[in-house]
């Protein structure tokens, strides 16, 4: 896969980024270099390689999953103009 000047300009337009002609030409080379590196990575044989989440072996800290109300409901609605039993009240918008 390769990137051409039209693709760079299209992506810049979609991202709403102003890119000069010189910058766009430079980006063509940079993006093609990145894509070439990604293609090299996809060619590496990783069969038998164990997936890892860190470069150093460590156990993830876990906590028990407990359902709570968070004890913050009153704080959350404290600045709301109108509430009812810790719920925000808003004007009806759909009939």
UniProtKB/Swiss-Prot annotation:
Its EC number is 6.3.5.-. The keyword Nucleotide-binding applies. Pfam families: GatC (PF02686). GO terms for biological process: glutaminyl-tRNAGln biosynthesis via transamidation; regulation of translational fidelity; translation. Allows the formation of correctly charged Asn-tRNA(Asn) or Gln-tRNA(Gln) through the transamidation of misacylated Asp-tRNA(Asn) or Glu-tRNA(Gln) in organisms which lack either or both of asparaginyl-tRNA or glutaminyl-tRNA synthetases. The reaction takes place in the presence of glutamine and ATP through an activated phospho-Asp-tRNA(Asn) or phospho-Glu-tRNA(Gln). Heterotrimer of A, B and C subunits. Belongs to the GatC family. This is Aspartyl/glutamyl-tRNA(Asn/Gln) amidotransferase subunit C. It comes from Rhizobium leguminosarum bv. trifolii (strain WSM2304). The lineage of its organism: Bacteria, Pseudomonadati, Pseudomonadota, Alphaproteobacteria, Hyphomicrobiales.
């Amino acid at each position: 896969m390769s990137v051409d000047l039209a693709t760079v300009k299209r992506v810049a337009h979609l991202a709403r980024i102003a890119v000069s002609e010189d910058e766009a030409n430079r980006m063509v080379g940079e993006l093609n270099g990145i894509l070439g590196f990604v293609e090299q990575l996809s060619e590496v044989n990783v069969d038998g390689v164990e997936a890892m989440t860190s470069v150093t072996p460590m156990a993830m800290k876990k906590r028990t999953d407990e359902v709570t109300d968070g004890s913050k409901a009153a704080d959350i609605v404290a600045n709301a103009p109108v509430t009812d039993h810790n719920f925000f009240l808003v004007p009806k918008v759909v009939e």
